[in-house]
Amino acid sequence: MAKHLFTSESVTEGHPDKVADQISDAILDSILSKDPLARVACETLVTTGLVLISGEITCKCYVDIPNIVRETVRDIGYTRAKYGFDCDTCAVLTSIDEQSPDIAMGVDEALEAREGLDDLFSRVGAGDQGIMVGYATDETPTLMPMPIYLAHRLARRLASVRKNGTLPYLRPDGKTQVTVQYDNGRPVKVDTVVISAQHHPAVDLGTIRADLIEKVVEPIIPVGLITNSTRYLINPTGRFVIGGPQADTGLTGRKIVVDTYGGMARHGGGAFSGKDPTKVDRSASYAARYVAKNIVAAGLASRCEVHVAYAIGVAKPVALRVDTFGTGLINEERLEKLVLEHFDLRPAAIIHHLDLRRPIYRQVAAYGHFGRGDLNLPWERIDKAEELRAAGTGG
């Protein structure tokens, strides 16, 4: 395979789209903490001085949405009017309906149950049709692609040096991007690092550039991946004072590639944040990552992409596909059979096995839903790896 470049981006928690994602998931978590069986599809829009919450929510509890919004925005760091967005003074509007009964009936009683199949996990149908994708690769410790792995770590570091006072002139909005050179399918060096960091107007670009390279880039990018030709593009427009919702309207679900694999894997198109686990956009994507990660951890492939497709109101997936891109120890048809034997991908089974009716979602609404070594996420476990290895190799 010839040498090639691959680029992935991440954003900080103060990016307007991520503000929206975190608000949606904070509302979801609050509801699930009181009503684990709630149906939630919560969408958020943030713009100058305004947060709009909309969607469909059916639950048996009350949550204080304006307070959740303000506390989430406060935690992110928009605490002063001069940032263009202030947790204490922004308006919070809500427009919420209940889940459509036509959708609810298919989730409450799956096609299989209506046809007489008496099985606990066949009672709950998928909340929508769609294609969900999971991916894993052995090129990083978290089994994530190197470009998104590094981009997320840079974004988290950028937020950390702002919050802990190391670089007090930074403000909440920010973006990172990493271009990695591959040789024969393996990452060999970092070609380009891009960081755009919102800042106080009085700080000059030279100071920002020097500080971000020293305090953000150097602690994160492995020395072995840096060369004399590695480029650093720090605030390449020259100025980033106006940011956050004042500069760009933020919407839930607008960073689906950042949330997943940085473009290295295909994507079915469904977003995650604000959705309870009966929405297979979320739960089945987590399950597909769980499957792919266990296949790679088992040594059955160096790279693995898992596709799962669903029909609304039907419990059993309508299709499964495993692609190892030529890295598989065994053929893909055999891998697909192993997946069906060792993983139950019906929505109720996913929810049960991964214990998804819990308030665990706000924590993944920024810096990626996958490969989070800082969190104990059920879909990141590799507890099936040994049995897959034994079944796949006959050992």
Curated annotation (Swiss-Prot):
EC numbers on record: 2.5.1.6
Q: Please tell me where L-methionine binds in this chain.
A: E56, Q99, D248, K279
Q: What class of enzyme is it?
A: transferase
From the UniProt record, give the pathway where this protein acts.
Amino-acid biosynthesis; S-adenosyl-L-methionine biosynthesis; S-adenosyl-L-methionine from L-methionine: step 1/1
* Residues that hold K(+) according to the record: E43
Compartments where found: Cytoplasm
Free-text function comment from the UniProt entry: Catalyzes the formation of S-adenosylmethionine (AdoMet) from methionine and ATP. The overall synthetic reaction is composed of two sequential steps, AdoMet formation and the subsequent tripolyphosphate hydrolysis which occurs prior to release of AdoMet from the enzyme.
Q: How does it assemble?
A: Homotetramer; dimer of dimers.
Q: List the protein's name.
A: S-adenosylmethionine synthase
